[in-house]
Design a protein with these regions (language model features):
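C-terminal and inter-domain tail/linker signature
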Residues: 1-133
């Protein structure tokens, strides 16, 4: 039996390795994801499409988990995101700028699977870093 913090750790390992091939091992098939960049997905395939879009824009994206708090089926994580803006991200063309911004994620776990993810990132900071020079 895996504990909730370890499951969330596997989620961030998946992001940092850029390998989502084992997503079904940690996500429920009806995963609901709400990202601070305005994206809502339902299901593993939609989440993978979102991840592919983000990684096309920031191919070396890294999630540094700084604080992890577990309360029952909920896990809250304070994260610093970093990488290089190499591709188009929404309306922002590639700038080759290094980015670093913080956020918080709130994950719900049921039956040893992540069922819901809500991300609140500092969009203002991110957008200021990826505006054209």
């Amino acid at each position: 039996m895996i504990n909730n913090k370890n499951l969330v750790s596997k989620y961030y390992e998946m992001w940092n390795s850029h390998d989502f091939s084992k997503a079904a091992n940690i996500f429920s098939e009806n995963l609901r994801f709400h990202g601070s960049l305005g994206t809502d997905t339902v299901g593993i395939d939609e989440f993978k499409e979102y991840a592919d879009m983000i990684l096309a824009a920031i191919p070396n994206l890294y999630h540094a988990t700084e604080i992890v708090i577990e309360e029952g089926p909920q896990v809250a994580v304070y994260v610093t995101y970093s990488g290089t803006h190499k591709g188009k991200l929404y309306e922002y063309e590639a700038t080759d700028n290094r980015i670093s911004y913080s956020g918080a994620s709130f994950l719900t776990i049921r039956n040893e699977k992540i069922t819901d993810i809500k991300v609140l990132g500092d969009r203002y900071s991110l957008y200021n870093q990826i505006k054209a020079k």
